[in-house]
Amino acid sequence: MDYSYDEDLDELCPVCGDKVSGYHYGLLTCESCKGFFKRTVQNNKHYTCTESQSCKIDKTLRKRCPFCRFQKCLTVGMRLEAVRADRMRGGRNKFGPMYKRDRALKQQKKAQIRANGFKLETGPPMGVPPPPPPPPDYMLPPGLHVPEPKGLASGPPAGPLGDFGAPALPMAVPSTNGPLAGYLYPAFPGRAIKSEYPEPYASPPQPGPPYGYPEPFSGGPGVPELILQLLQLEPDEDQVRARIIGCLQEPAKGRPDQPASFNLLCRMADQTFISIVDWARRCMVFKELEVADQMTLLQNCWSELLVFDHIYRQVQHGKEGSTLLVTGQEVELTTVAAQAGSLLHGLVLRAQELVLQMHALQLDRQEFVCLKFLILFSLDVKFLNNHSLVKDAQEKANTALLDYTLCHYPHCGDKFQQLLLCLVEVRALSMQAKEYLYHKHLGNEMPRNNLLIEMLQAKQT
């Protein structure tokens, strides 16, 4: 749905620089980019770029490369789910609260400009400095190994990490008897790790959930109820770390000639994902869905949730020259540069750039849990039995995040939009990571019984 716009604010389309005509699909854009985005989504068009996928898009050149134009539409924040699938006029009215608040902010901004006698100019987002350049090189430390917390034995020595090629992966609708079945409901056939207690972990002495949960967060004024509930669902990080380290101490079931460091990273990712599945099972709305819908949602976003979990850990870590693993171990980026191939190294550096961007945005825990919820309830997923419930969850999370950012970061009026743009980059990173894993699998380099590979294969069947 299009919303009226104050022309005297004189903003330019973030895609091509043409004059803005109104709010279209979640963003202020021109009429041309509005129509282009709508036609692309409704007709399910797929473009290719004849150059290097970095074509300049402006008012005069916007029709030369539809691939780069559509990518820019997504990058600046146009929303796929706002386009109606039935080709009727008018978009899906899910961004009404955002439009109204955004308009109020712009009216306030216009009044300040008139009062101060300044001319409104387009520029970088308010309160968000540009990310610094990639970190410099550092001295190489010893290789990757399992840490030794609380008396656990040390892990095997490190080995080199490999390289890969990266063609696109096919995407398909998952089935209900895939790799997640045994995690969501233990009665379903699946792998050995069940929904409550993963097999490599010893049963706790007293009954209870697999992970400890913090005390309810009071939050103070301006914290929406949804975010308060999500904060209570977050598992205790120390317990998650201890469980994953304990699992890594178990004898590996993979190929014995595999590089130890790569095997460990795969097993870390597996166990991290299991903790994410446990979190999802406890989420409001998600636990109300049928098992088939639960599996569809998780199989759609598992890689994004893993990437976002890693990114937020680095934001908390706060060190540009190293990466903090889920086990609590620091790995210098130059270790990756020395042991990994150029493509994997590029993926790590790209992730680091996103970390710097989120750090500049001052991403906090309240925003993290809400964004994670938004990733889980993506409206891009098709063939859901209860799409309306997922849509309602997405709308409530969007509203909660917008209200929170406006209340707690009034000096950054566009923080809500900038956070959603970060999710676009999270998705791009997750696709690149899946391509890396898949080609490791094709090269017979992945550990056996790897859950992530099973997730990839479920996408293709």
From Swiss-Prot:
Residues 222-459 form the NR LBD domain. Keywords: Acetylation, Activator, DNA-binding, Isopeptide bond, Lipid-binding, Metal-binding, Nucleus, Phosphoprotein, Receptor, Repressor, Transcription, Transcription regulation, Ubl conjugation, Zinc, Zinc-finger. It is found in: Nucleus. A 1,2-diacyl-sn-glycero-3-phosphocholine binds at residues 341, 436, 440. Residues 10-85 bind DNA. Acetylation stimulates the transcriptional activity. Sumoylation reduces CDK7-mediated phosphorylation on Ser-203. Residues 119-153 are annotated as: Disordered. Residues 126-139 have a biased composition (Pro residues). The modification N6-acetyllysine is found at residues 34, 38, 72. InterPro entries: NHR-like_dom_sf, NR5-like, Nucl_hrmn_rcpt_lig-bd, Nuclear_hrmn_rcpt, Znf_hrmn_rcpt, Znf_NHR/GATA. A zinc finger (NR C4-type) spans 13-33, 49-73. One of its GO terms (molecular function) is lipid binding. Belongs to the nuclear hormone receptor family. NR5 subfamily. Transcriptional activator. Seems to be essential for sexual differentiation and formation of the primary steroidogenic tissues. Binds to the Ad4 site found in the promoter region of steroidogenic P450 genes such as CYP11A, CYP11B and CYP21B. Also regulates the AMH/Muellerian inhibiting substance gene as well as the AHCH and STAR genes. 5'-YCAAGGYC-3' and 5'-RRAGGTCA-3' are the consensus sequences for the recognition by NR5A1. The SFPQ-NONO-NR5A1 complex binds to the CYP17 promoter and regulates basal and cAMP-dependent transcriptional activity. This is Steroidogenic factor 1. It comes from Equus caballus (Horse). The gene is NR5A1.
